C-alpha cells in the first residue's frame, strides 16, 4: 500500500510538544511519527507522520491537533514509493534467538543449532520478524507458559506475520487460530504457516478484534497471545475474559514499560491475575491468568 508522509517544520520545543500530542492522538492506529533536526543553529526541526489509507482524514486530524496547541503550520505531503521495507530490512538482519526459538530468514537456514525450534519468516508486509522487543519477549514468555500449562486450544490475536502462532504450534503441537484486521497480514501469516510446516494446525482469519463467527466456534481458548498496542488491549479486556477458559492464560505485548500498570489494572478488573512481566528494550510482555 502506498504511504504518504505528512510533514512540517518548527522549533525544537514546539516539535517536542507536537510529537507528544500526535503520539497520543494516533496511538491506536500505530502511525509512525518522527522528529528530525534539520538545522541546529536556526532551530529548525521537521515533524513527520506516515499515513496510509484515508490520508485526508489523517491530515485534518493533524491540523486540528496543531490548532489545539495554538499553532498554525503548513502541512506538506510526500507520496513515498511502494517499497516492501520489511523485505528489504530482512535482507540484512541477523537471526534472532529467544528461548528455544530461532527466528530467521531464508538466508540463515543453516545457522540453526541442534535442539532449537526454527521459525522461518518470509519477508512480507506484516509486522513481526522476531527482532522487535515485543516479539522476542512474547516468544520467551510463550515457551515458559506452554511448558508449564500444556494448552490445547490457542488464539493469536493480531497475528501479523504469524511468528507467535507458529511458535505455539511448533512448541505445543495444538490448533491455533491466527487472526488479524489486515487481510494482507492474514495472507502473509498463511504463507508463513505453510513455510514452517504447521499449516494443518494454524487457521488464519481476517477479523477485527473478536468480531467474527469463528470465535463462537473455537472458543474458549486456554491460551491467548496478543502483541498489539496497549490501548486496544485495554479495550479488549472484557472480550478476552469472555473467550478465555477458566484457568487459561493470556500473554500480552506491544506495551511500553510506562503502560504496564494500566494494562494490568484493566485485566485485574476482569478477574485476571498477574503472573509475571518480562522487560525487553523498553517494552513489556505480561502473563495473566483467568
Curated annotation (Swiss-Prot):
Keyword S-adenosyl-L-methionine part of the UniProt annotation: yes
Binding, S-adenosyl-L-methionine: 135, 158, 180, 227
Main location, first listed in the record: cytoplasm
Signal peptide: none
EC main group: transferase
Disulphide linkage map: none
GO molecular function, a single term: protein-lysine N-methyltransferase activity
PANTHER family: ELECTRON TRANSFER FLAVOPROTEIN BETA SUBUNIT LYSINE METHYLTRANSFERASE
Protein name (database record): Ribosomal protein L11 methyltransferase
Protein source organism: Mesorhizobium japonicum (strain LMG 29417 / CECT 9101 / MAFF 303099)
Lineage: Bacteria, Pseudomonadati, Pseudomonadota, Alphaproteobacteria, Hyphomicrobiales
